[in-house]
Amino acid sequence: MNSFAYLFERFPSFVQTFVYREAAEMMRQGMNPWLVSLRRPEDPGELAEQISAEVFYAPEEKELRAQVDAERAARRLPRKPHRAIPRHRSQPDAQRMFEAIWLAPQLRERGVRHVHAHFGGVAARTAWWLQELFGFSYSFTGHANDIFCATELPVSNEMLVRGAKFVVTETDFARLWMEERYPHAVGRVFRVFNGIAMDGFPPREPAGAVPRIVSVGRYVEKKGFSDLIEACRFLRLRGVEFICEIIGGGPLESALRGQIAAAELGDCVQLVGPRSQAEVRRHLAAAHVFALACVPDQDGGSDNLPTVIMEAMATGVPVVSTRIAGVPEMITDGVEGFLTEPRHPAAFADALERMLRDTAVAEHLGRQGRESALGKFSVEKTTRALKHLLVQHAPVIPPTAARAADREIPTVSPWTRWLRRFRR
């Protein structure tokens, strides 16, 4: 019997390694969650071989709908989902309802009563339908734009929060933001930091005589790479010697390359493209300073708790970032790194220059950051906090009672096995 189910839109995902680490650690701590992914991974990287055997994948969308429609035609669905299909099938995001109807008997087969989703998006809305049609309880972890930006879908963010047993956020900033907008959720929103495996980030050994600035993230507005490049232009004008490597990929790549060329920074600022997690670690270990100039984007979204800042701290790299969302909960200005206001590249350049010119200060801040990361962000500690919430606030089987479950897909239609239980 599984203690609960993790429900993901797409798992594993190389750009969401913190989710993989949490799921793996939850299993190590004895909770025996059932891992369910609604879609197959596009970019699992080196994670796939480590955990893919543990993941149960839903069929492709058309096949899943066909299976549900066949069960309805044969009158093998409980009354509530049977009636819901014609009412909602043409609505936007109706696939979430079909996923819930298809998934419900699979969950019952494994004794699962509670579902935890990551992100207030596709998986959380499927979990909402599981509750609405079948009475399963759910919780979810909200991360950044999924909670900060409203959706125009039938299942709104407000409905997700109202229906959840509890909601997890990465930061106190996000917790207070949600409680202000959803007063009914006060007392049900909890802060649990994302976790990292500290042993995967050995202390750094900066490489090369030329100081190296490293930044990592998708090439999107909220990462502030345009401001970082502008800060690098200021550094060049001040005669500071450096190399800046920006690791990632995304829709702004062409614009960023144009900005680098226009500023004649091609010899010192490099867009190095996407890299594997192991390669990112090597770049961090060789860095003199890590920089992430986060900004709010035009839709009001922003980073909340950038995992890569945790990883830089764990490596002992001094950090320069901005005062936005939960970043000040990671970095206290002048203690673990330097913070500036968003969209002030000249001030960002000042902080970078101080790091690059005063190696004693940089080394001290790097050591402080590593100690802070050990205390706040170890995956063992953060997963234990989520496990406590699941046991205390949801119908979840505690670790001592969890048993290994048969993860094979049932050969007999699971709808037939539990139909009577849900006839109303």
Where are these regions (language model features)?
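Short hydrophobic beta-strand element within catalytic cores of glycosyltransferases
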Residues: 309, 314, 318-321, 331
